[in-house]
Amino acid sequence: SMTRQCQEPNHLVLGYVSTEESCKSVRRFDMIRKTYYLLRRAQRSYGYRTNMPNVIFRKSDFMREQGYQGNLEYVRGEYDFLVNKYALCGDTAVELAPSAWLQQEAPTDKNWHNKSLYLQASRKSLKRNLSMRTLMFFDHLIPHLSLIASIAVLVCSIVMKDWILTGCAGFALLLLIVLRTIIAHRAVACFDSLIPTYKLPFYDYGIIWRNFANKVRYWRADKN
């Protein structure tokens, strides 16, 4: 199925890679969430990078642009670099047919954390980095502001014993969580139907804390 996209004007084809069911569901959720961002960017403009080793590119582009030139100083991140560099050679196609999927082994804790460290180290060399990070920042900021505002109004209304406002704030908070859970379930189910629905709001709102933990690991890592 990937090869059917190998025609003009496409110069790059990105596919999906699933992970073994033994992988922690929160990690499968994180991979799917990142995949949506990266594939959407590839479809709408230029590919930024990929978090999955399922890529087809033109040999002629690879030879003309001197292969991995520009990424030789990094130990990992070759797929990120390939997509970032060769997406500019022409259009990027996305193939999501299940017959084109690959499957990878469940990463160990060490491999999972190292992958995040390698990305943080190499991200500064990727083009179009700012626009992607800005998009993800506001996508995280807005729902968290809504959550904080709903909780704040709920607490204040309880303190003031304004029960009508308490009911409205409680309903707004519940509606926010339910809607985001439904949206997350529909998105995740396209690639992984085994992630428990009741865990999705915790995974969703826990993203910023997992990202912060990754930042701390990077700050503490030996970069020599």
Model-derived features: where do they sit?
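Select subsegments of transmembrane alpha-helices in polytopic membrane proteins
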Residues: 135-143
